Amino acid sequence: MSRAISLHSVSKTYGRSSRAVDRFSLSVAPGEFVVLLGPSGCGKSTVLRMIAGLEEVSEGELLLDGEPSNDLSPRERGMAMVFQNFALYPNMTNRANIGFPLKLENPRRDHTDRVESTARMLGIESVLDRYPRQLSGGERQRVAMGRAISRRPSAFLMDEPLSNLDAKLRNHLRAEIAQLTAELGVTTVYVTHDQAEAMSLGDRVAVMRGGVLQQVSTPREVYALPENVFVAAFIGTPRINLLQAVVHAPLEGRMSIDLGRQRLPLPEPLSADHQLLRIQQGRPIIVGLRSEAVRIAPRSQARPGEVALSGIVEHVEYQGHEALVHLNTGSRPAVVPDLESARPQAPQRRRARSGGTGVLERLKQRATGSVAVLDHPAEESYAVRSPDRPAVTASDLVVRTGPDMRLRTGGQVPLLVDLAHLYVFDHSGRRICPLPRDIPGLDV
C-alpha cells in the first residue's frame, strides 16, 4: 500500500549552528512522484534521509499516513532506498542481492517466485545468476531497484540513482523509472540536481536552496511561474536572461523599463501585470527573459505585444538543431549567488574572529537572505579594456535561433522581445509578474 508522507516545519541541525535543513514543509500524497531538486549541498539528500529514518529530525514533525513517525526505526517505516552507488553485495549473485531483504524478513520462506517476477519486470532475468561485477552500470542499477521493489515497500526513496551513468543510459532508465513507478503506484520521493530528470519524472517538483524550500509546483508551473529569481535561473536551458532594470512610470507618457542603454516600452493599454509595476517606479528590479521570448528580426516584422531592441553578436553556439546567440545589449546582468560567481574582486584579509562574521553565519545569511544580487558596476564594466588589445564586451542576452541563420561576430542585429513572456522580480528576487492567470494554458 502506498504511503502518505508529510513533513511539517522540519529542520536538521548539526552541532550548535550548522543548519542543513531549515523549516521544511512538504506533503506527498499516496502514489505521488515528488522530486527534490537543487544544487549540491542544498539539503535535499538530508530531507530524504530524515524521511527514511537514517537521520534524526532536529525540529518539526514527520507524519506517515497521518501518524507521528519521528521516532520510528527505518525498518518500521517500510520504505526502500535506491542510492547512486548501487550498494550491492559483491560476493552475492544478483538473484541473492534482490532476494536479500526478503530473506531477512522471512529466512525460511522460498522467495524465488517474487525475485524472478521482479527481475522480469526490470528485464534482468537473464543476469540473475551473475555477480554485480559482471554487469554494466545500467544493469547494476536495475538490480539495485529490483532489491527495493521486491520488498513491496510503502514508498521509494531514490537518492540520485542515475548520476553515475552516462547520458544515454540515464535517459533510458529515466523512462523506465517513470513507467515502473506509475505501474506500481508507489509513493516516490526522488532526489536530483538534474533539472531534466526533475521535469520529466515528477508529478511535482520541490526546489531547494540552502536548506530552505523555495517552491513546490508541477513541472510546468515551476518553469512558467517561478516564485523567485533562483527558481527561474535554476530551471530552464539555456538559463533565463536576468537583467538589472528600473521602471519609469510618468504620469503622462508611455511606461517603460530602463535596461541601461535601451528601454522596453510597455504596450498600451497596460495589462494588469504591467499596471502593478507602477508601484516599482524608480526602484531597482530584475527583468527575466527566457531565450524563446526574444527573436532576431527587424521591427517591421513585430507581432502584437513585441517591442524592439538591438544587440551586438558576441558569440554563437551551434547546437545542430538550433543555435544559441550570445548578445550584448548594454544591460547589466543580475547575479544569482548560488549558481554563479559575481565579478572577481580583490582578495580581502581575514577578519579577526571577535569582530568578523563566521563562515557558518555567512552561510546562514546566504540561505535565508535574498536570492539575487544587484551589483552596480562602473560604466567601464561594459567593456574590459587592455592597453594592447581592443575592448572586449560581455554578453548579457542569449537568444535561440535556427541553425541556418548567418550572423557575424561583432555585428549588430535587431531584436524583438515578446512582452507576454516578460518576468519581473523585485530587488530581493521575488516575482512581481506575471500573475498566474496570464500564463496561457496554465491552471493554478
Regions found by a protein language model. Give the residues of each.
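ABC ATPase nucleotide-binding domain
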Residues: 6, 27, 63, 414-416
